[in-house]
């Protein structure tokens, strides 16, 4: 070890292709139903090269080998007689990172989001929206350290378990004019 020294470096990250399709249907009395599907082309993310400006350090290559991922989202909204809008939703998201690249820096994993919400019209053009989301996943094994040599597979270092639970509360005031 020794003192950390400031140094320059560069990398390039190409964002994945994405395709989404969705629809909403309001043909039922007071109901709006919606659904969408997203595909994200993460399979093109094979490695991340970090080029250091100090020639002695050279380039560090992190192997990623991501998979394509997808998400499905479903929602419903009911407008009551007092024009309050009651909402419920679900989103399921598939992880892109393979087990050998899951780390504390990016503990990517499959997850489910469950939501409820309420829209209250206060005056003409002014609405108060409140929502709650619960994010859950089943947990996922991942590594705590990088392989120390190319002959060590990242998946053999999967000695950590990552879980995620989140409670998200949102309140907003919407003005329409």
Regions found by a protein language model. Name each.
Residues 1-177:
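Outer-membrane beta-barrel porins/channels
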């Amino acid at each position: 070890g020794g003192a950390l020294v400031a140094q320059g470096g560069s990398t390039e990250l190409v964002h994945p292709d994405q395709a989404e399709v969705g629809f909403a249907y309001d043909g039922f009395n007071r109901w709006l139903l919606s659904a969408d599907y997203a595909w994200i082309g993460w399979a093109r993310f094979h490695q991340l090269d970090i080029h250091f400006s100090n020639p002695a350090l050279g380039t560090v290559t992190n192997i990623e080998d991501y998979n394509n991922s997808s998400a499905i989202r479903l929602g419903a909204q009911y407008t009551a007689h007092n024009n309050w809008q009651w909402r419920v939703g679900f989103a399921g998201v598939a992880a892109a990172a393979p087990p050998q690249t899951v780390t504390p820096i990016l503990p990517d994993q499959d997850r489910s989001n469950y939501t409820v919400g309420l829209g209250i019209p206060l005056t003409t053009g002014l609405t108060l929206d409140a929502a709650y989301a619960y994010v859950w996943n089943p947990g996922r094994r991942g590594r705590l350290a990088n392989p120390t040599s190319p002959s060590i597979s990242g998946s053999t270092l999967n000695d950590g378990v990552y879980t995620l639970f989140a409670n998200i509360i949102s309140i907003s005031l919407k003005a329409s004019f």
